[in-house]
Amino acid sequence: FDLTVPGYFYRQNAGGSYSNASGCGNETASEREMVRHYIIESVKFWAREYHIDGFRFDLMGIHDIETMNHLRSELLEIDPTIFVYGEGWVAADSPLPFEQRAVKENVGQMEGIGVFNDEFRDGLKGSTFDEQEPGYASGNINGHFEPVKYGIVGGTDHPQVDYGGLLYCNAPYAGAPSQMINFVSCHDGYTLVDKLKLSVQGDHAADELIPIDKLV
């Protein structure tokens, strides 16, 4: 991209170096008109020519809300059943103002787009970043009950959820339950059964942990 239009396709810090909200050395500047055009036209091509019926955006928070909403509306014209979702966070800070980022806290401004629910994930199994911390499923009932409830109501406003007891946010952010994707484990971090082995207190045989794994 830089060979095409130097300095245009990637965001820069004040000193001119590449910003790195992706954690991979750079980040595309989706808020710029031709970067936005490239992203949207690429997705439309894949949907039309390859009949792809769902798009997952890694570190979706790098992109701006306007681009994601435009992309969603264009896909609706092709096939209203196409699913759009992503990771509602960034790997590091970005020059893009927080209120413009397509992060989970702003998903209420992105109708028809879903985000992963890391509150429910870590509430149920324990912290992804602390291998020995247990979650609700492994006995940490008091400390992780609210994040589990938050997942049950789909990240929406509900009178039975104490939002002050959440792990990473203090308010509901989904406009509808369909915008919240509950999950427990994925390609990142430990598999669920390995996380249980590390976090469940005491010595437990595999035949004791497997039922917990299946229950979750």
Where are each of the predicted segments found?
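Substrate-binding/active-site clefts of carbohydrate-active enzymes
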Residues: 1-50, 63, 67-79, 83
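Active-site-proximal loop/turn and secondary-structure-junction residues that shape catalytic pockets
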Residues: 61-63, 90
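Conserved alpha/beta catalytic core and glycan-binding cleft of carbohydrate-active enzymes
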Residues: 72-216
